Regions:
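Conserved donor-binding loop and adjoining core beta-sheet/short helix segment
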Residues: 42-75, 142-143
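Intrinsic-disorder/low-complexity loop/linker signature
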Residues: 8, 53, 63-64, 123, ...
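Acyl-donor binding region in acyl/amide transferases
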Residues: 61-122
């Protein structure tokens, strides 16, 4: 499915999730993905925030640490800006370190783009390749 420029049209959660499901390379069948997402967003200590046509799901842990994922239906340039806004939001919530995992290596490009001009001082990330072929990002939100 085509991405939708949030500067031209704002989508709702269901529309964003549907587009993200179609465009994500996942082992979960499409018909099972939406119920899984709906279950995930209702878990305790979970924060859901929409920035543009990107929905960020954060599972808050202890000591300012959390695991997050993004459901994106926005254009690439907006996805970068939405992500910058989100990490500032997460920092204001008291988060210090966020972790995410994904299978599509193109997503790591997003983190490299943000690291060139981070929205907060001291912000950085480390990328790890997983045995499964996926990747893990550990994002330090800085000062």
């Amino acid at each position: 499915m085509a991405m939708v420029d949030s500067k031209e049209k704002k989508l709702d959660f269901a529309q964003i999730a549907a587009i993200a499901i179609k465009n994500t390379h996942s082992s979960v069948p499409d018909r099972m993905a939406m119920p899984a997402i709906l279950t995930e967003v209702t878990q305790p200590n979970t924060d859901v925030k929409q920035m543009g046509n990107t929905v960020f799901i954060l599972h808050k842990g202890k000591n300012g640490q959390g695991f997050f994922k993004a459901l994106n239906a926005d254009k690439a340039r907006n996805f970068v800006e939405n992500s910058k806004q989100y990490v500032v939001y997460a920092k204001k919530m008291g988060m210090n370190m966020l972790v995410t995992e994904f299978d599509d290596p193109a997503i790591s490009t997003l983190f490299h783009a943000i690291s060139k001009k981070p929205p907060m001082p001291g912000m950085g990330f480390k990328e790890y390749k997983l045995k499964s072929g996926g990747r893990r990002i550990v994002l330090n939100l800085g000062k």
